[in-house]
Design a protein with these regions (language model features):
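Mobile, glycine-enriched helix-loop/loop "lid" segments at the mouths of ligand-binding/catalytic clefts
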Residues: 281-300
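Conserved beta-strand positions in the central sheet of alpha/beta enzyme cores
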Residues: 218, 255, 274-275, 341-343
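Short amphipathic alpha-helices and their capping/turn segments at secondary-structure boundaries
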Residues: 204-212, 291-296, 328-332
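Catalytic cores of extracellular degradative/oxidative enzymes
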Residues: 153-154, 168-263
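Terminal accessory/targeting
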Residues: 1-194, 200-201, 264, 268-269, ...
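Acidic, His- and aromatic-enriched active-site or binding-groove loops in soluble protein domains
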Residues: 214-224, 271-287
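Conserved residues at the C-terminal ends of beta-strands
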Residues: 257, 277-279, 307, 345
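Short, surface-exposed amphipathic charged segments that create phosphate/polyanion-binding patches used
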Residues: 232-236, 290-292, 389-397
Length: 439
């Protein structure tokens, strides 16, 4: 833990919001200074980086990062800010949802989500508070250390600038019927993807067909009624059923319906990875967000956060039939070398206008893959890489370093250094383009 000047980690501040180094929004108890209980648009108390502070942060880095990733800042926020609509309204909505057309649903959702663009935190359209804070900690270490650069294992295999993950949540019969055509479309652009299937949909044959074509199948909630995380007892009962179905189908990943979540309950799910946490959830019924564009562990489960707007929200809530917002989010995530992840529903892109938007996105990703060295992979491959990377170690090698451990043949040594007041990265031995081979 970073310590204060007395040599012991202490705090007198109340738990709340503050900024560090003028940019990173934090939630926790700093070792000095004040906090704000709520975010109301006023400037937050700032803990300036002191030039002669040495390798000491004025905050508990682990606590603040966990609070943001696990969305614990929601504990003191007004409930209306993070759950849009009462439970009775949500129950009624999900009871009649199957018979509502998209036109009626999007009208109701626009009413329910009114004011979403005025929510101050997490920052829209991409929040990288955790990543900014980690970079500030690196800056402090570089300032305090004698070496001009610090080695680390690069985030992605083969020196790729960022990771890309395409996923398809299948909500109903209409979506199930379009899965085959959607796989063909993804294949035509060389984009691997995963399909999340509702276990109670009776679509075992569709799951087998998807897997036979080389695509991933994951589970999507239990029955998509929006109640999975309503209370702990119900969740644990359904978790047993979900786990049993995952074993039968050989599924390694999970995503809840409508991105409802309670990360502290994830240990009851027997999956290698989860995809239920958005980066910023202004357009979801459950507000919040993990404030990072990087995968992270929740216990033994790797969280692969959703870092871009869902197709339904883009097309039917905002009403934007271009990929301009997606392109903006991609650039913001690329600047952080993060995971660019998408949800595109086969239920909503099977008509001409919506399908054309998705084709534009696929074409854009295909161009960027070559121009910007993106690693485009299904979630299972990303989970395997990230777990391997966590177990890798830097090994001294003459005057430099090499990476040791399983999968290290695809790993790259990178160096962080300061360019003025900015942390910059240099990748050693990066290839011209990411490789598709495994080791």
């Amino acid at each position: 833990m970073f310590q204060d000047d007395s040599g012991a980690a202490t705090t007198t501040a109340d738990e709340g919001f503050f900024t560090y180094d003028g940019d990173a929004v934090c939630y926790g108890r700093p070792f000095r200074g004040n906090t704000a209980k709520y975010l109301n648009g006023d400037p937050l108390p700032d803990l300036a980086m002191e030039p002669h502070s040495g390798p000491r942060l004025p905050l508990d880095l682990s606590e603040v990062v966990t609070n943001l990733r696990r969305e614990r800042y929601r504990r003191i926020r007004p409930r209306a800010e993070f759950v849009a609509g009462s439970s009775s309204v949500r129950n009624l909505y999900y009871a009649v949802r199957p018979v509502l057309g998209v036109a009626i649903r999007k009208h109701l959702q626009r009413l329910r989500l009114a004011g979403w663009n005025a929510i101050p935190f997490p920052r829209w359209p991409v929040d990288a508070s955790v990543d900014t804070l980690m970079r500030s900690a690196m800056k402090l270490a570089l300032r305090a250390g004698e070496a001009p650069r610090i080695p680390f294992i690069w985030f992605w295999p083969d020196g790729a600038d960022a990771g890309v993950m395409m996923t398809h949540d299948v909500e109903g019969e209409r979506g199930l019927k379009y899965c085959d055509a959607l796989m063909t479309l993804d294949e035509s652009f060389g984009i691997p993807s995963s399909f999340q299937i509702v276990p109670t949909s009776g679509a075992a044959d569709v799951c087998v067909a998807i897997q036979r074509r080389g695509f991933e199948v994951n589970l999507h909630d239990w029955n998509h009624d929006g109640r999975l995380f309503r209370d702990k007892r119900l969740f644990l009962k359904r978790a047993e059923l979900i786990n049993a179905q995952a074993r039968r189908l050989g599924c390694r990943g999970f995503r809840s319906a409508v991105m409802y979540r309670e990360q502290d309950w994830f240990d009851a799910l027997e999956f290698d990875y989860d995809m239920s946490v958005p980066n910023v959830a202004h357009l979801d019924p459950q507000r919040g967000g993990c404030c990072t564009v990087m995968p992270y562990f929740v216990g033994d489960i790797l969280e692969l956060p959703l870092t871009t707007i869902q197709d339904y929200s883009l097309l039917h809530v905002i009403g934007d039939y271009s990929i301009a917002l997606w392109r903006r989010q991609i650039e913001l995530i690329l600047a952080e070398h993060g995971l660019i992840s998408f949800i595109v529903h086969p239920d909503y892109v099977n008509t001409k206008r919506e399908n054309e938007v998705y084709v534009q996105l696929l074409a854009h990703l295909n161009r960027l893959r070559a121009q910007r060295k993106l690693w485009v992979a299904p979630p299972g491959d990303i989970e395997r890489w990230w777990r391997q990377r966590q177990a890798m170690r830097l090994v001294p090698d003459g005057a430099g370093w090499r990476v040791g451990g399983d999968g290290s043949c695809r790993a790259r040594v990178a160096y962080a250094s300061l360019d003025g007041d900015r942390v910059v990265y240099e990748i050693e031995g990066a290839r011209e383009a990411p490789l598709a081979s495994r080791c």
